[in-house]
Amino acid sequence: MITKNPMQLKAFIKNKAAEKHISAQLVMQNYMLERLLERISLSPYKNNFILKGGFLISALVGLDTRATMDLDTTIKGFTLTHEAIRKIFTEICAIQIADDVQLEVVGISDIRETDDYPGIRVALKANYPPISVPLTVDVTTGDMITPREVEYTFSLLFDDRTISILAYNLETVLAEKLETVLSRNIANTRPRDYYDVHILYALRGAECDKATLRRALERTTQKRGSGLILTDYPEIMKEIRESDTLRRLWEKYSREYEYAKDISFDDTCNTIQTIMDAIKV
């Protein structure tokens, strides 16, 4: 989107935030991540990056239904090293688009929070002076995508056009979320995992192929060494439902996010149970 000046961009952002009932900061963050994504789609590396995580879920269900602050991708076709990632992102940031935004790489670090897949975190800055927005991109490798990534048509926030990127298929997104919820059991302190399963299935469940989802979940649990959840899920769900801590966390989450306020913790648990019963191995 071409804007006359930063004030005009801020006005667009403010209007979109009011329309979607989310904060202007979230809309600005998503707009700048979108600017990065368009550069990836125009780069020689467009077939090496596969979009996943919260940004993809937001694209699937709508920004007013699921907001996120960072970008998650997996890569294929080259070895994941600090040097390679710095070179690739420096090249991507150098791509010029008529959007007045300049991107720069600020830092590269290892992802420490999860052992699911090896990963690197890229810190970037999106500049449209005096606007400066810090961005985070997590890059992993070795992800289990079943059966394969898909070409996803991504609608832009302010322009009446789309960009094409590779992304996880719906079944793999759901499989990873289900595995996370069930394997972490009552130790999971992230209500959004429950929300994501619920909203994806509510809005996109009709498009989900049950046999593919079953296979995706089997392969994800094999990769993560959590195969027991496939048979133990009724007991796990009973523990989850009885957890006062998880209920309190959910109540806090639903107060914080407008889009979750009419969904109960039991609703999310019922959705997970329904999916698992439907794909019973």
Residues covered by each model-derived region:
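Structured mid-to-C-terminal alpha-helical surface segments
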Residues: M1-F49, A59-A67, L71-V281
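Catalytic metal-binding/acid-base residues of hydrolase active sites
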Residues: L56
